[in-house]
Amino acid sequence: MLQKFNYFGEHENYVIRLCNPNKEQICFLNQSHTHELSLRFNEMSEFHITIPYLIDGEVFPYYDRVLSKKLILIDDIGYFLITEVNETDDGIVKQKTVTAYSLETELAFKKLNLFDGTYKFYDPFNVENTLMGKILSTSNWKIGQIDADLWNLYRTFEIPDSTVYEFLMNDVENSYECVLL
């Protein structure tokens, strides 16, 4: 995650886009919207944005396409999954307030499909037979960089009834003494 700051140490404005779940871009969301981004290391980041129905007296043409399960792309930050959309209309101002979480929130909706046992953390030559390969085989996530010190480590797990995200962030990080980003 690269951050851009100006000469005065202030964060530069983000370019914000609404996308379909397949990451196809729909429109820009920068015009007259208030937004708040909470970036977190090794945890889900959070993004809130308010999207007005009218912008400069004109109907925002993509207003009705802002829906739960769509994605928001913030340049140089990443994708966020829209989890909540609340529409308010007080007779004067109609708007949608959107809550989105960084894309790893997808893993919080997937149940873990592993049996109790001993697992090798990772092997770049036989990925599908490792813990990381088995966990990520049911998702669109790909393995980036893994420190070679972790490749040949084995750990035994009593697999809990949890989501993929909970298992990775709690059991895997603690057992292998690593940080997943």
What are these regions (language model features)?
Residues 1-118, 169-176:
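Assembly/oligomerization scaffold segments
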Residues 101-181:
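Charged- and aromatic-enriched interaction segments used to assemble
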